[in-house]
Each structure stands twice: as structure tokens, then as C-alpha cells.
Amino acid sequence: MMENMKINQLPSKTWNWLKMNETAISGITVSGAHEIKAEIPAGISKTNCPAGLPDQFREVAGGMGPDMDVLVRESAAGAVLLSTDGDLAETPVRIGFTYGASEHSLNTFGIFAKEGSKMTVIMDMAAEADGASGADHTALSSVQTKLILEKDAEVTLVQIIRNDNAKTVLNDIGAKVADGAKFSVIHLFLSGDHVYNGCKADLVGKKSTFTADIAYTIGNDAVLDMNYVALHEGKKSVSEIKTDGVLHENSKKLFSGTIDFKKGAAGAVGNEKEDVLLLDDDVVNQTIPLILCAEEDVEGNHGATIGKLDDDMVFYLESRGMELPKIYKMMAKARIDAVLRLAPDEKTKADVASYLESEATNGRI
């Protein structure tokens, strides 16, 4: 079983002294799959795959890179395959995780959306209440999700990472998107000590689409390392990556966003936008946007806003009786809420809203 991994490698390397080309992690061991709770609606089939996902998923590359695939193979933890039976699954698939403070687990999922079908999958990665102190939390939670979207299929994947018990979180996504298909990711990063996330969408089809809406709040010395890649191969393919987050209390964030236009992707459009709010002076914010072009007839855009709260706004809110810590919490919650509203499931919205309220009450947001 591998213990050392290199993940989130950039497709095109930048200066080595920046130490942003890849991330090295160690002490990675898994002992099996976490026992999930799955709600499978009509129109969706769930198949357990003890030997791993079908061969067709091997061609799908994840955002964390090949070392994650090696970890999955060596773990022999099996996989779960979700596939559409009909054209439309009106109710979302809900997959719940409740992690303990010391488990080391890996779960693998395959999502196969047949031609013209639509489905939503919600993964809520939470922690069980065990009463252990943060110093006693040694858990590793790792999840890999690979998707194949056939022509005109639509898949929305919502992932909520709020595992307070995890010392390390690994979350890997890879998707292959055919003609006219649409793949949407909604990510909420709410807790976890060291969280590593990779997401790659291969837009192989004409007019295929990938959107990612990401929100995070990081504090208490936590680390969030994110790598998103939109690989444009199909003509007139479209990608949109939007990130909005808050850093405070000696936290660190690395965001790598790549829009890669391959030869033949004429008419493709890729957009990337990041907004970061820094609430303390001791935080570390790193961002590396990449736009790679092997095709002339394309459009790629990147924009970033990084800053602190406006002094006039703070003065106004304080003059209305709000204390500075409450102002910070309000701003952090507002950014999460803006992305949470995009989740197509009222139950999920209510659960996360309740969690955020509890975290704010306990002073953790």
C-alpha cells in the first residue's frame, strides 16, 4: 500500500521556487471502504462492484492525478456504480458519510449517465460526534468519483466536505463529457484539517459543458489544496469555474485552475473567476491560473479579486451594533449561502444551513 503520493500536478509547470507545481503528501494508508448511507430514487440503478469500476472508467482521468488511481487499485476496496435507467431521475441520489476520528477509508464511485438522461448526486461527507479532541483526530477520508456522460446527458454532483474528524481528506473527480452533455459540480468546503481536492472534466464532445461552483471557509490552521482542470477537446465546448471563499486564523489555501484548449477545439470558451476574502493577517493565499492554448479560435478568461473587508463597511456595521467577529462570520456565511442556493435539493440546503448555524454559535466559523 502506497504511503507517499504526489497529487494535483499542474499540466504545465511554473517556477519551481513557488512550490505550486504539485503537492506531496505522506502517511496515506487505507483499511477499507467507509459504510455509506445511500438513498437511491426511482430511475437510478446502484451496483456494487467488488473488483472495482468497469474498464470503461479507466480512461477517465481524475484531477488529483495517477497516484490516486494507484491508491484505489491497491486498496481493493471495491466500488459503487450509479447509472440512469430512464431519461430523468426527479429525486437526487443522496450519499451520506459519517466518519469516525481514527478510520482510514477509501470509497470509489462511478456515475454513468446514458444519452439524454438527467441525474443529481449529493455526497455529504460529515463527521460523527465522538467527543474526542481535535488532537486525537487521525482519520483519513478519501473518495474518488468518475463520471461518463453520454450525448446530451446532464449530471449535477454536489459534494459537501465537513468532516471535523479528518486529519486528511482526499477528494478526486474525473469526468468524460460527450456531445451536448453538461456536467456541473457544486463544492462546499466547510471543515477538515488538510483537505486535498482534484477535479478534471474532459470535454471531448461538441458543445459539451463543465461548470464548477466552489465555496469555502477555512480557519484554525487548516489547509485547502484545490486543483480544477477543464480540458477542451470538443468544438464549441464551454467551461465556467467560479470560486468564492474566506480565509482566517492562520489558514492556507492553494487554488490551481487550468483551462486547456486542445487542437481542434475551435469555438471553445473557458472562464475562471476567483474571489477571496482575507480576514486575518496570518493567512496564506496562493492562486495559480493557467490558460493553455493549442487552438487559435478559442476564448479564455481569468479574473481574481483578493482583499480584505472594506473599512467603511466595517465602520458602518460596527456603528449599527455589530461586533467585528460577528461581521466576519456574516461575510463567511454569505459566501457559502450563495453557492448553497445552487444545490437542487431543499433537504441538503436545510441540513447545511443548520450545520453552519451550529458552527457559528460554537465560534468555529
Predicted regions and their residues:
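Long, low-complexity, mixed-charge
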Residues: 1-77
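Extended amphipathic alpha-helical segments enriched in small hydrophobics
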Residues: 316-338
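A generic "cationic amphipathic patch" detector
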Residues: 2-36, 95, 130, 160, ...
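Conserved beta-strand/loop scaffold segments within soluble protein domains that form the structured core
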Residues: 56-315, 319-322, 343-365
